[in-house]
Amino acid sequence: MDFEKKIKDDRESLIRDIMKLVSIDSVESKPAEGMPFGEGPAKALQCYLDLAEEAGLQTENFDNYAGHADYGNGEETVGILGHVDVVPCGEGWICDPFRPRIIDGKLYGRGVLDNKGPMVVCLHAVKILKEMGIPLSKKIRLIVGANEETD
């Protein structure tokens, strides 16, 4: 099976996973035990790492500050960096920003573009590489933070 076909076949799963992560309100809030940036960012980080584990990647959560998911065994590592927290929603939303929806073929919700959606796309790309057994000379590490959007 070629890579492009596999990507097309993965579309529904990709959209489902983006919607799952976007549905978590991950605006920074009051810190709590084990959640340095509040409950939402911690939940979003764990959700992302759970998706990575389901894809067969090795994960590690660094006390809800950040985490990573690895694939491959090379001595060198290629890092892909992103985050799962979002800025406060502000005014002007005509629908709940944490209830993602598809309208006219476009996915809407807080974090779809910055940065939950792109990180899930990266995860699915790595998952497809793994499923296809494509050999890598370097390890791929998806590094995800829970506190990029704060002051």
Region annotations inferred by a language model:
Residues F3-V112, E131-L136:
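Acidic/His- and Gly-rich active-site-bordering loop/insert found
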Residues N115-K116, V120-D151:
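Acidic/histidine-rich catalytic neighborhood of metal-dependent amide-processing enzymes
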